[in-house]
Design a protein with these regions (language model features):
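Membrane-embedded alpha-helical hairpins and interfacial helices in multi-pass inner-membrane proteins
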Residues: 20-71, 157, 162, 180-281
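Interfacial aromatic-anchored transmembrane helix boundaries in multi-pass membrane proteins
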Residues: 109-124, 144-179, 189
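Small-residue-rich segments of transmembrane alpha-helices in multi-pass membrane proteins
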Residues: 104-110, 133, 173, 196-205
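Hydrophobic transmembrane alpha-helices
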Residues: 8-23, 28-129
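Structural signal for the C-terminal ends of transmembrane alpha-helices
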Residues: 81-91, 133-135, 174-182, 263-270
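Hydrophobic cores of alpha-helical transmembrane segments in multi-pass inner/ER membrane proteins
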Residues: 74-83, 169-176, 251-264
């Protein structure tokens, strides 16, 4: 009888220990995820900015990030893999999140295959609606993964790839920070407005990946010895000449797609998130 009681007590104690371990993982995993996402954003920001901070070093390396581009991709790839393994290791919600990420990433690849019409590509609608529905963390991760995968399929591998990954990831994160409450009309209006603005901001940021290496002394080039305000004027002039018209196609295209299919796609993602019990992060 004593043995049975002891066995019963041990059997009842086991679930308690398992529950405590599960609770510890529940507390730990979100913190690790946030730290990894923050690290990826910091790496992306430094990748864009370091030539401005260390112009003497930039002048001696291969132009247009041909020397450091692969290292940036490797660093971002390692962080993305860590995030995916973290989600898969959670159990329950994790694999569902990764599966949805894979489906939406494949959609981005399919929409990029036809190429760009001027600066517009329909892949941005996926990042915009997914980020808005599933949150800034998911939006950033999808932007990075989708651009990397699509770069492989369309032959877009080059020193520009890590900058595309980060820039599209920022578009998805920004969409996730928009208000989601209120009426559908307000939500779509916010998303359309952000799609328009992000169409220009994406191009404005992407031009920075190679502009610091244009040091030919022209009025549109980077001048390491010039002041900050002078270089801002140079860059804005360069952007107007090189990218403004191109990016207008993207901005207008984003608005058209959001207004045309934004609501049904958002509703489908919201419904999938509820059924799969995905948390907006």
């Amino acid at each position: 009888m004593t043995a049975r009681l002891e066995l019963g007590l041990e059997t009842r104690a086991a679930p308690s220990a398992e529950a405590e371990a599960r609770e510890r993982r529940t507390i730990l995993v979100p913190g690790v995820r946030i730290a990894l996402l923050a690290l990826a954003n910091v790496i992306g920001l430094l990748a864009f900015l370091w030539p401005f901070v260390l112009p003497s070093v930039a002048s001696h390396v291969a132009e247009n990030h041909q020397g450091d581009g692969p290292w940036i991709v490797a660093a971002l790839g390692a962080i993305l893999l860590a995030l995916l393994f973290l989600e898969l290791g959670r159990g329950g919600l994790g694999p569902k999140t990764v599966a949805l990420l894979g489906v939406l990433g494949a959609a981005m690849v399919a929409l990029r295959l036809p190429g760009f019409v001027a600066g517009f590509s329909a892949l941005f609608i996926v990042v915009l609606v997914a980020g808005n529905s599933l949150g800034p963390g998911f939006g950033f991760l999808l932007g990075c993964v989708g651009m990397f995968a699509s770069g492989i399929f369309v032959g877009g591998l080059g020193p520009w790839l890590p900058f595309e990954m980060v820039a599209v990831g920022w578009v998805g994160a920004g969409a996730g920070l928009l208000p989601r409450g209120g009426s559908w009309r307000a939500r779509i209006a916010w998303l359309a407005a952000f799609g328009f603005v992000s169409g220009y901001l994406y191009g404005l940021v992407m031009e920075l990946w190679f502009w610091p290496f244009l040091t030919d002394g022209s009025a549109l080039a980077w001048d390491p010895g010039g002041g900050a305000w002078m270089n801002v004027r140079h860059y804005l002039g360069f952007y107007v000449v090189d990218g403004l018209t191109w990016d207008t196609f993207r901005a207008v295209g984003n608005v058209v797609l959001v207004l045309a299919i934004g609501r049904p796609v958002l509703a489908a993602l919201d419904r999938a998130a509820r059924r799969m019990q995905l948390r907006v992060v």
